[in-house]
């Protein structure tokens, strides 16, 4: 992932990534891939598809709980399939995390992270991020969280963030990983 200017008229930047689709491999949103309309149904779909695919789904949802992604709806994650045969190949890479990591706070509001974290909720109803993680966390996800013990952000040369902001945000991510 990288950063790029959203448009020439503003100073806003956005996260970018390479396209993961090719003429041979296409992306199908969760809502269309399995014909379901809830995260509970998604869990069942991935379990039926196989444990490795469920583990990928669980890791994405625990990651969302880690970064407080408030926008994980059923069209911004899904599967990759063979464009010619329709065979399901794998879960699509994680993307569209723009409404996370306290995106709504200004750089000078780093001391608001703990307070903000108390009120942010995931996109699926009637569950907190802590509950979301608790329902899906397993040994693989715990190992992934443990690996964040010395996590830090790499700043972008073309679009730098204030170092104090990145340091405080990385500290919050490390503490959050321990909590989960």
Feature-to-residue mapping (PLM):
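Helix-hairpin-helix/helix-loop-helix acidic hairpins
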Residues: 31-59
């Amino acid at each position: 992932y990288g950063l790029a200017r959203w448009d020439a008229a503003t100073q806003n930047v956005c996260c970018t990534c390479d396209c993961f689709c090719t003429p041979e491999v296409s992306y199908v949103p969760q809502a269309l891939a399995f014909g379901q309309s809830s995260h509970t149904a998604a869990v069942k779909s991935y379990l039926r598809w196989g444990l490795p695919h469920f583990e990928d789904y669980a890791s994405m949802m625990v990651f969302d709980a880690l970064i407080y992604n408030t926008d994980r709806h059923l069209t911004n994650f899904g599967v990759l399939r063979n464009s010619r045969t329709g065979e399901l190949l794998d879960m699509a890479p994680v993307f569209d995390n723009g409404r996370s990591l306290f995106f709504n706070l200004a750089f000078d509001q780093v001391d608001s992270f703990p307070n903000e974290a108390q009120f942010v909720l995931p996109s699926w109803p009637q569950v907190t991020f802590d509950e979301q993680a608790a329902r899906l966390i397993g040994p693989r996800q715990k190992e992934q969280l443990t690996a964040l013990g010395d996590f830090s952000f790499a700043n972008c040369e073309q679009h730098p963030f204030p170092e104090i902001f990145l340091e405080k945000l990385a500290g919050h991510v490390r503490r959050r990983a321990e909590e989960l």
